[in-house]
């Protein structure tokens, strides 16, 4: 409970509000909805992924690091934002891949639901192999940023690798 710690609550609310605002999560969702049923260009697809999944995971990393031992270190927070963005882009690429390549039974939810809804996905735009390469690239970026942050982050490193290798 941080109700008696406005010095912590105010920055956390600011981080989350920035991630959720019209220039981030809300804007990305709007573009995602507008792109349904069409083939988006590279800039639109990037905007959607950066401002939805990327922004959300960027905020999560920044808030977690802010509350940690190195929370006052702006350099660490910058690395955390970069880590979160890379992780978000890797996660989104894997999500698109899994939706396109796994069965309903394997996923535990409807497979190919993105295609059925006419969603703008990396697979629809780039194809399976290039999307897989993007997932690997962004995962390596995230691992690099996590290692640079340092500290007791073995769980984070394992989580990043798990997200690349997940099956659902």
Show the residue positions of the predicted features.
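All-alpha prenyltransferase/terpene-synthase fold signal
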Residues: 1-168
